């Protein structure tokens, strides 16, 4: 047996290192992941655009549909159903894989957009918003599952950063673009224009999801039945939040009854779904969840009602209102 000389070993190590250096690092835009990355990030961008841009069109839509008194329900309808959609999507993805909840979520989101964009009455507009929320909740969680299954661990931070950018960019340009569309084409186009744009991202992403992320997340060990307790808790959160919103809109004494029922449903259900210690800001995940909830709630409240005030009370156009609303929100 011949023992390699030191110089031979050094040459072999040097050659191996040079090969590693020469090989290009795999990224989320490499050939193997390009179609999937572009497709799912585009879906996130479209959902983010609709979520951030709708506040600009809402004051005009509510005024034309004679539904300013129901204005808040157009937002609460979306968020309450999205809460249920997110929990149900997690259960569905664990047991059947992310493809089904993703496709159903996108279909529901598109249907809700069409319902809202073609609504002739405020109640139908709110129904469309609720369907949008259900679809949005299904999609968001399913996309996270896709990331966990389709990408290696070293690429997941990059695709999650792309998701974050997919929310940041529409939040900056979306309200202004929505205001211009509302002012020059009409508020309905803010809603009915999105379903057409989602076709191409779906065509890119779905074949890749089917080949890379199909099937139950747990494989053969995945639970066969849904977790009924969590689904009931999510439904209780949605119903409780809806009843509480209804009671807050009606200042008569009779509204105390639905308000009390809403609190009775909402508080225990939220305690059952959130990490233990969230309400006392316990160290770790509970405090993160609490702070994110407070920050998101404040931001959404400002983005929802400041444009309404600027359009109805200050006479600003839908194009100018987002800029003023954004500056006020940034100052807060």
Please report, for each region that a protein language model flagged, where it lies by residue.
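Hydrophobic alpha-helix/TM-entry signal in multi-pass membrane transporters
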Residues: 36-40, 102, 109, 125, ...
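Interfacial helix-capping/hinge residues at the ends of transmembrane alpha-helices
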Residues: 55-59, 144, 178, 307
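Small-residue hotspots at the loop-to-helix junctions and early N-terminal turns
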Residues: 62, 66-73, 161, 318-326
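Helix-loop-helix hairpins in multi-pass membrane proteins, especially solute transporters
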Residues: 93-224
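Cytosolic juxtamembrane N-terminal segment immediately preceding the first transmembrane helix
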Residues: 1-49
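12-transmembrane solute porter fold
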Residues: 33-49, 54-56, 75-77, 84-88, ...
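Transmembrane alpha-helical cores of Major Facilitator Superfamily
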Residues: 45, 76-80, 107, 130, ...
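Hydrophobic transmembrane-helix bundles of small-molecule transporters
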Residues: 183-298, 303
């Amino acid at each position: 047996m011949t023992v390699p000389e030191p110089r031979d070993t050094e040459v072999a190590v040097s050659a191996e290192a040079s090969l590693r250096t020469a090989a290009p690092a795999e990224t989320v835009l490499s050939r193997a992941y390009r179609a999937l990355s572009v497709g799912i990030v585009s879906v996130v961008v479209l959902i983010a655009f609709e979520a951030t841009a709708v506040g600009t069109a809402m004051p005009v839509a509510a005024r034309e549909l004679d539904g300013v008194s129901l204005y808040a329900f157009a937002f609460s309808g979306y968020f309450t159903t999205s809460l249920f959609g997110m929990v149900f999507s997690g259960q569905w993805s664990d047991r059947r894989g992310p493809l089904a909840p993703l496709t159903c979520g996108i279909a529901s989101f598109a249907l809700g957009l069409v319902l809202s964009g073609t609504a002739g009455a405020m109640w139908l507009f709110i129904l469309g918003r609720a369907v949008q929320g259900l679809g949005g909740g299904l999609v968001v969680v399913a996309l996270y599952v896709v990331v966990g299954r389709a990408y290696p661990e070293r690429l997941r931070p990059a695709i999650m950063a792309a998701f974050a950018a997919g929310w940041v960019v529409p939040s900056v340009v979306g309200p202004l673009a929505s205001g211009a569309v509302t002012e020059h084409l009409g508020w309905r186009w803010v809603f009915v224009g999105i379903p057409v744009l989602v076709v191409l991202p779906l065509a890119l992403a779905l074949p890749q999801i089917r080949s890379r992320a199909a099937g139950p997340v747990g494989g053969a060990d995945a639970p066969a039945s849904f977790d009924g307790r969590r689904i009931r808790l999510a439904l209780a959160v949605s119903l409780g939040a809806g009843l509480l919103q209804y009671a807050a809109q009606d200042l008569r004494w009779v509204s105390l009854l639905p308000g009390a029922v809403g609190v009775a449903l909402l508080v225990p259900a939220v305690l059952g779904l959130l990490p233990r210690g969230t309400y006392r800001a316990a160290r770790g995940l509970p405090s993160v969840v609490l702070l994110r909830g407070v920050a998101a709630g404040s931001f959404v409240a400002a983005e929802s009602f400041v444009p309404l005030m600027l359009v109805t009370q200050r006479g600003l156009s839908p194009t100018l209102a987002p800029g003023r609303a954004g500056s006020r929100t940034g100052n807060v």
